[in-house]
Amino acid sequence: MEEQVPMTAPGRWRALTTAALALLVSACATAPHDGASSAAADASRSAVQPALGVAAAPKVLPPAALPERAPDALDPLRPDTRIDLDSRGARTDLWARVRNGMAMPDLDDELVRKHERWYAGRPDYVQRMTERGARYLFYIVEEVDRRGMPMELALLPFIESAFNPQAVSSAKAAGMWQFMPATGRHFELQQNLFRDDRRNVLASTQAALDYLTRLFNMFGDWHLALAAYNWGEGNVQRAIKRNLAAGKPADYASLRMPDETRNYVPKLQAVKNIVLDPQAFGLTLIVLENHPYFVAVPIERDIDVALVSQLAGLPPEQFAQLNPQFNKPVILAAGTPQLLLPYDNANTFVKNLQRHPGPLASWTAWTVPRNLDPAA
């Protein structure tokens, strides 16, 4: 993404049902802050196979009780919204939901064909990319849906980073959505010694959708908005002015732009076409069920990353996949009010944290008072 100095703008909001769960850590933490038709889901399953290492979300039970069925889920960002995780709608194929929400005009040119062939010739790469994206895609789809945006945008991290939240470009763009440092700061993505929120799954997704909403409001065209996301809004504005001054069309296909930007929307169109009909390209997509992969667990005390992994029974590399923003081995609760954990590990973490007898952090940050004499 080209470095910009944007201002956020709210997207369109609409009602939805959502399926995330907030776990309340008694005495150790404070509270933080729909689906496609079954027919479409059944039709889509003929082109998918089970994901490797991506299990269906288990029920999360309160530590003090073991009822026969799990309680309704609670969204950590919208705690008044609940959904029955046992309902049929909660298990609808997420790919069907993505397909049903696609609304951008199609590109149909040789560049699209070129990228279709590239992906079709690399089934192992597509498999790895979709398995990685399985951790994050439900949350992104929920946010795109909530804002009433075209569902093609949920596929954009495939193009930006292959759904790798640790990705860093040669130009220093970072995270799943590839924010440049200055652009990230303008969207309040903190970048300091302890964390880089350009890699934060929740914060970077919110910032990216804010930015894309602003760009669409500026250009009135999703292809131009995407070009601006990649190349920079100022560059797109100047390219439009040049074409208009020369009496030429000012649509995406008619503008003069760098090769990377020229290929940007065709790449997204190729991924869209593959998601719509993977069998046509000799590909098979993994099954993605329409429910969350992770849960947000609130914390109020500093805690070591290694201790979180230990208490959650989660390998450190898996913790880092959901919480890639941390730069140091300690998590400062003042700047990080919640952690992301898979459902079953979140429940384990809550129980073990309540029983943990020792300190949570082996070291922490300390601000030197201005009046302290270092030589004293």
Residue map of PLM features:
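Short, functionally critical alpha-helical segments immediately adjacent to catalytic or ligand/cofactor-binding
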Residues: 149-166, 225-231, 320-323
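Substrate-binding clefts and substrate-entry loops adjacent to catalytic sites
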Residues: 114-128, 163-170, 178-220, 240-255
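Extracytoplasmic/secreted proteins, especially bacterial periplasmic and envelope-associated proteins
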Residues: 110, 114, 128, 132-135, ...
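Bacterial N-terminal signal peptides that target proteins for export
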Residues: 3-17
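Extracellular LysM carbohydrate-binding repeats and other cell-envelope/extracellular binding modules
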Residues: 322-356
